[in-house]
Each structure stands twice: as structure tokens, then as C-alpha cells.
């Protein structure tokens, strides 16, 4: 008798053919997957390189910005000092003057004061002289309150000028303020 039952562990010819076809179909799929993987790895390497370049460029920009700020501070002080040199020259000339002419010395001091004021203004240092203005605790320091005809809390007199630099108070003005009636 002939055995018509097939052994389940032995592949049939049909199974072998389908496995060959599957293997042949899998080969291009594997090649495609390998190609896609290689392409993805190349893209990752490219992006990593781009990231490192961008990071280095950002660091360079940050360093250049710090250098620029440092130079700006240095040269701002240099410019301010240059504006003060004529004041120094005038004071030295006054000290060396032996004429004894009080009017001439006073004229020289007034000129020196104008030079100093000009130098400070070029450095954006501006005097606060608030007579008649409403008292502002950010710009004024009240020394006393006095009875006055002016509106209450108005600056009556300035004992010492205050100064600002670029809208920032260097020194508040020392003032006397009108007392409420």
C-alpha cells in the first residue's frame, strides 16, 4: 500500500516553491529596508553635523556679542574721559595763574563750569532742578517742609541739584517742599 498521508514535518513541493518565492520577494524588501536604513543613518549624520555647526555658530555669536558689549563700555568711558580733558586743562591753567586778578579767575571758573556741564551733557548726565514741580520721591529727597503759597507737596527750593544719566537717577535733588495748609 502506498502511503497517501503526508508527513507534516516534511515540506511538500508546493510549500518549497512558495518559500522560494517568499525568499525571492523578501530579498528585494530586505535590500529596500537596508537602503532606507542607510539613507536614514546618513540623514541623521547630516543633521548631527548641522546641529554641531549651528551650536558652534551660536557660541561664536554669543562670544562676539560679549566682546562688542565690552568694547562699547570701554569706548564709552574713553569718550567721556576725552570730554573731561578740556576741564582738566582749564583747572590746571587756573592753578598756574599767578596774576591775582580775581575777575579773571572768576571768568576762568565760569568757563570751566560751562566746559564741565557740556562734558556731562555729552555723557547724557543731566541736572535735576525741580523748582515749582510736584515732589517726586524717585528724583527728589525732601529735606524739610515749609509753609508756602504754592500748592502742597510742591518743590519750593533746591538745596543741591540732582543728576540723571539716561533717565536713571545718579543723585536725587535735595529739596524743600511746600507744607499742606
From Swiss-Prot:
The gene is grpE. Residues 1-12 have a biased composition (Polar residues). GO terms for cellular component: cytosol. It is found in: Cytoplasm. Pfam families: GrpE (PF01025). Keywords: Chaperone, Cytoplasm, Stress response. This is Protein GrpE. Participates actively in the response to hyperosmotic and heat shock by preventing the aggregation of stress-denatured proteins, in association with DnaK and GrpE. It is the nucleotide exchange factor for DnaK and may function as a thermosensor. Unfolded proteins bind initially to DnaJ; upon interaction with the DnaJ-bound protein, DnaK hydrolyzes its bound ATP, resulting in the formation of a stable complex. GrpE releases ADP from DnaK; ATP binding to DnaK triggers the release of the substrate protein, thus completing the reaction cycle. HAMAP family: GrpE (MF_01151). GO terms for biological process: protein folding. Its main location: cytoplasm. Homodimer. GO terms for molecular function: adenyl-nucleotide exchange factor activity; protein homodimerization activity; protein-folding chaperone binding; unfolded protein binding. The keyword Ligase does not apply. Belongs to the GrpE family. It comes from Burkholderia cenocepacia (strain HI2424). Residues 1-33 are annotated as: Disordered.
Amino acid at each position: 500500500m502506498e502511503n497517501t498521508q503526508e508527513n507534516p514535518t516534511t515540506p511538500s513541493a508546493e510549500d518549497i516553491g512558495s518559500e522560494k518565492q517568499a525568499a525571492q520577494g523578501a530579498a528585494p524588501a530586505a535590500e529596500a529596508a537596508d537602503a532606507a536604513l542607510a539613507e536614514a543613518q546618513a540623514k541623521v549624520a547630516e543633521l548631527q553635523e548641522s546641529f554641531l555647526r549651528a551650536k558652534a555658530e551660536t557660541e561664536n555669536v554669543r562670544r562676539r556679542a560679549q566682546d562688542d558689549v565690552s568694547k562699547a563700555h570701554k569706548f564709552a568711558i574713553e569718550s567721556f574721559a576725552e570730554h573731561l580733558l578740556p576741564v582738566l586743562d582749564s583747572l590746571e591753567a587756573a592753578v598756574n595763574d599767578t596774576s591775582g586778578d580775581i575777575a579773571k579767575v572768576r571768568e576762568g571758573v565760569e568757563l570751566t563750569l560751562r566746559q564741565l556741564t557740556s562734558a556731562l551733557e555729552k555723557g547724557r548726565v543731566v541736572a535735576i532742578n525741580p523748582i515749582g514741580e510736584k515732589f517726586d520721591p524717585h528724583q527728589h529727597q525732601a529735606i524739610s517742609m515749609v509753609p508756602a503759597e504754592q500748592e502742597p507737596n510742591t518743590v519750593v527750593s533746591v538745596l543741591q541739584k540732582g543728576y540723571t544719566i539716561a533717565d536713571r537717577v545718579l543723585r536725587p535733588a535735595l529739596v524743600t517742599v511746600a507744607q499742606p495748609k
